[in-house]
Regions:
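Concave beta-strand-loop units of leucine-rich repeat
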Residues: 1, 7-10, 15-21, 27-33, ...
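Active-site-proximal acidic segments at structured loop/helix or strand boundaries
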Residues: 161
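Extracellular/luminal ectodomains of secreted and membrane glycoproteins with large N-terminal domains
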Residues: 200-201
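Surface-exposed alpha-helical segments enriched in charged/polar residues
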Residues: 206-209, 241
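Extracellular/surface-exposed low-complexity segments
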Residues: 235-247
Length: 247
């Protein structure tokens, strides 16, 4: 069955949650001028049409297990995309050029993501998916500051060209190689439960920047830096003094 909303051209924000027996939802006709949508926990939703909702700025579509794809139209103002816990295996976001924050976590079969070249994306959350490589994704995100890609199938991760990265969660993959920008100061670096050997960990430690001593007077508390690398083959034999010398 379909959910019919009527004609609401003046609606700016739409929230629809926990609805059953609805397989298709077409927002193009009902609310073409909507700027924010929150579509969650539709147990039976298989098809969602938002191609003609050109004014969308925030897209939240989550916890719809039977929803395997979304066809995006031109959404030049959309800045945030929250689409976790769906059934996506592949997704193209090329028609959303203004995106800054992406959350596609817990799409358990998602293994392919297309982005525009040289986006302004600052945060990507794809933990709990099925990615074997995200090299092409990283190339499109020179402004990336936060990456969460834990619980995937990654064997290598190279962020050498992502100079703004400050938070990285890549634990519970199969990483044998992890590279970060030379001299980078990551406030959070969680790379435990991978396959990083002694040399890989030492190389990672060498790449990290020197933590500066806080000034005697400062208006805000000094930053804290956290790293977790246990449960790797090289965790016991790596040179922890490299890290100690940077503090």
């Amino acid at each position: 069955s379909d959910l019919h909303l009527g004609n609401m051209p003046g609606m700016k924000s739409l929230v629809l949650n926990s609805i059953t027996d609805t397989r298709e939802l077409n927002l193009n006709t009902f609310c073409p001028n909507v700027e924010s949508i929150n579509i969650g926990s539709f147990a039976d939703l298989e098809h969602l049409e938002i191609e003609d909702c050109f004014r969308l700025r925030s897209i939240q579509v989550y916890s719809n297990p039977k929803l395997t794809s979304i066809e995006f139209g031109s959404h030049p103002e959309a800045e945030s995309l929250y689409c976790s816990y769906n059934g996506f295996s592949s997704l193209s976001l090329k028609s959303l050029p203004a995106l800054r924050d992406i959350d596609l976590s817990s799409n358990e079969v998602l293994s392919h993501l297309e982005l525009n070249e040289k986006t302004s994306i600052s945060a990507i959350l794809i933990q709990g998916c099925a990615f074997q490589s995200i090299t092409d994704i990283l190339k499109c995100c020179p402004s990336l500051r936060e990456l969460s890609c834990s619980y995937n199938k990654l064997t290598e991760l190279d962020l050498s060209d992502n100079s703004n990265i400050s938070e990285l969660r890549c634990e519970h993959n199969q990483l044998t190689r992890l590279m970060v920008p030379q001299g980078s100061l990551l406030e959070h670096l969680y790379c435990h439960s991978n396959q990083l050997d002694e040399d890989a960990l030492n190389t990672l430690f060498d790449s990290l920047g020197q933590v500066l001593e806080p000034a005697i007077y400062y208006p805000t508390p000094p930053r804290q830096y956290r790293i977790s690398f246990n449960d790797n083959p090289g965790a016991d034999d790596c040179n922890r003094n490299i890290l100690n010398d940077k503090n």
